[in-house]
């Protein structure tokens, strides 16, 4: 039996997503990003509603925004700030039934790395990333390479 061709966001999205809250300290978010090798963390309320997105670039921007203090002191102070101080509040999203073609166009044209997947009420259901599209391309090309092998190779090359 031939597997069906993925056509919707739900077919390829990452369902197990690490999230942070607006009140979490930036150092908690940074640790999660580093440990899990993520570049984006969705920011959600206690009931799972998406309220923002924190990117690695947001953390770098926050760290470079206060040049007057000594570097170590500045970084310590910045990382104690809550996520809500630097997160992106205007976030492009998709829904599970949206087409992969449309979602891919949004990623490409907006020059972003991920799209949170939400339901009609705004509850986070997963994430669609550029890596999900690479994994899909490898599968469609008949590669027997597992995504975990690709991730291990990337970690070895980029630390």
Where does each model-flagged region fall?
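The conserved cystathionine-beta-synthase
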Residues: 20-37, 43-45, 93-111, 118, ...
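Tandem CBS (Bateman) regulatory domains
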Residues: 1-16, 56-92, 99, 104-108, ...
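A glycine-centered beta-loop-beta connector
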Residues: 33, 41-58, 107, 115-132
């Amino acid at each position: 039996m031939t597997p069906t061709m993925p056509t919707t966001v739900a077919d390829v999205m990452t369902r197990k997503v690490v999230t942070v809250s607006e009140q979490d300290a930036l150092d908690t978010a940074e640790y999660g990003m580093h440990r899990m090798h993520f570049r984006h963390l969705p920011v959600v309320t206690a009931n799972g509603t998406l309220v923002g997105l924190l990117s690695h670039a947001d953390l770098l921007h926050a760290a470079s925004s206060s040049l007057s203090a000594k570097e170590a002191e500045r970084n310590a102070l910045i990382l104690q700030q809550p996520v809500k101080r630097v997160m992106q509040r205007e976030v492009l999203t998709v829904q599970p039934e949206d087409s992969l073609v449309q979602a891919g166009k949004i990623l490409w044209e907006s020059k972003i790395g991920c799209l949170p997947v939400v339901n009609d009420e705004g509850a986070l259901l997963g994430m669609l990333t550029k890596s999900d599209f690479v994994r899909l391309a490898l599968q469609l090309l008949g590669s027997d390479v597992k995504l975990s092998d690709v991730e291990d190779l990337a970690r070895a090359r980029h630390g």
